[in-house]
Amino acid sequence: MDRVLSRADKERLLELLKLPRQLWGDFGRMQQAYKQQSLLLHPDKGGSHALMQELNSLWGTFKTEVYNLRMNLGGTGFQVRRLHADGWNLSTKDTFGDRYYQRFCRMPLTCLVNVKYSSCSCILCLLRKQHRELKDKCDARCLVLGECFCLECYMQWFGTPTRDVLNLYADFIASMPIDWLDLDVHSVYNPKRRSEELRRAATVHYTMTTGHSAMEASTSQGNGMISSESGTPATSRRLRLPSLLSNPTYSVMRSHSYPPTRVLQQIHPHILLEEDEILVLLSPMTAYPRTPPELLYPESDQDQLEPLEEEEEEYMPMEDLYLDILPEEQVPQLIPPPIIPRAGLSPWEGLILRDLQRAHFDPILDASQRMRATHRAALRAHSMQRHLRRLGRTLLLVTFLAALLGICLMLFILIKRSRHF
């Protein structure tokens, strides 16, 4: 946006639009102001023909240069087919309709944290991926708003407060022409499904792998379960008994041995496992409330014989969800269990062991700071022990050299006395 139009043309366009200078680059507000001023300056409405012509010229040049900002970076490899100027009237919100805000940010509390690595296919995460690809493929060291439309470039340009940034950024992208964002609309509607191996290796437990929550039971429609997993399509299906085995309350790994261990029957007593099957517990989690019986079985035999119908995936509501990031009440901190000392444990190994035992009790946002502090303490302990070892070796070497010098001096004195006799 800093290279769009000259400084004089910028000031003139903002003067005609009657907007302050800090709104330069906000395409939605500028377009709304352009429509209002067009009604006032139109010759048929009693306006000035010269001012109307000047406004149309500057506004058309502005849109053309914004369109060419990313095109001037070179081939990016992920751009979709570009439209002509006639197709710029189709905004992002018009493309996705009433469900734009759900498509914009699939899981606000998760997408805001996953800055570098995310398999989500919402608009927010896709624009962040474009930022990384533009820097890598186009060798663009510094990107500004217009060349990139990600959240970080938006915040850097406007300096938006953190608590309001999500809604303001959503409104900013909503009025932007979908053609300028280089988004594959099909990937937003139909996100790619991850392979079973990647889903099993995931370290974050999603709804699809941790059973049914009370919220899902209350919001599901048509006796269906709503499952949301980042990067995979969350499809509402009618519940069947096999779905309970694939959605246990615990994260488990299936193996075959004897005797069998009934892990899930403590939560779902109606589930019957075969005798040669055992479920090995990987990481215990808090059990969810038991699923209501009316959601476990169909209401009639006719409903049970109907084929499975896939409904449109569900998304978390975005409005006011980001406000929950800062809780009003103090969250109680759990005290980690005491550490049992072991023989032969170095100081830095003890620090790392203490940090690993606290990993399940500290908040997620403090994990990085805690790991940095542990790393620094481990380095200090390691450097001190290495310094002591080096000092001990030096003292041993000096003692050996002194003893060797004393022996040589003694031999020299004995040889000298023997010659006198």
Swiss-Prot record:
Transmembrane segments: 395-415
Ranges of the Cytoplasmic topological domain: 1-394
Keywords per UniProt: Early protein, Host membrane, Host-virus interaction, Membrane, Oncogene, Phosphoprotein, Transmembrane, Transmembrane helix
Any GO CC annotation of this UniProt entry: host cell membrane
Domain of life assignment: Viruses
Region Disordered: start-end pairs: 215-237
Pfam families xrefs: Papo_T_antigen (PF02380)
Residue ranges constituting the J domain according to the UniProt record: 12-75
Post-translation changes: Tyrosine-phosphorylated on three residues 250, 315 and 322, providing docking sites for host Shc1, p85, and Plcg1, respectively.
Residues with Phosphoserine modification: S257
Positions where Phosphotyrosine occurs in the chain: Y250, Y315, Y322
Annotated localization: Host membrane
Extracellular face residues: 416-421
Compositionally skewed regions (Polar residues) per UniProt: 215-235
Oligomer status and interactors: Interacts with host Ppp2/PP2A A and C subunits; this interaction alters Ppp2/PP2A substrate specificity and localization. Interacts with host Src, Yes1, and Fyn. Interacts with host Shc1, Plcg1 and p85; these interactions lead to cell cycle progression. Interacts with host 14-3-3 proteins.
UniProt function note: Plays a role in transformation by modulating the activities of cellular proteins involved in control of cell proliferation and by acting as a functional homolog of an activated tyrosine kinase-associated growth-factor receptor. Recruits upon association with host Ppp2/PP2A the Src tyrosine kinase components Src, Yes and Fyn, thereby activating their kinase activity. Activation of Shc1, Pclg1 and p85 mediate signal transduction pathways leading to cell cycle progression and cell division. MT also plays a role in regulation of early and late gene expression and in viral DNA replication.
Domain notes: The NPTY motif is required for interaction with host Shc1 protein.
Name of the molecule in the record: Middle T antigen
Organism: Murine polyomavirus (strain BG)
Highest classification ranks of the organism: Viruses, Monodnaviria, Shotokuvirae, Cossaviricota, Papovaviricetes
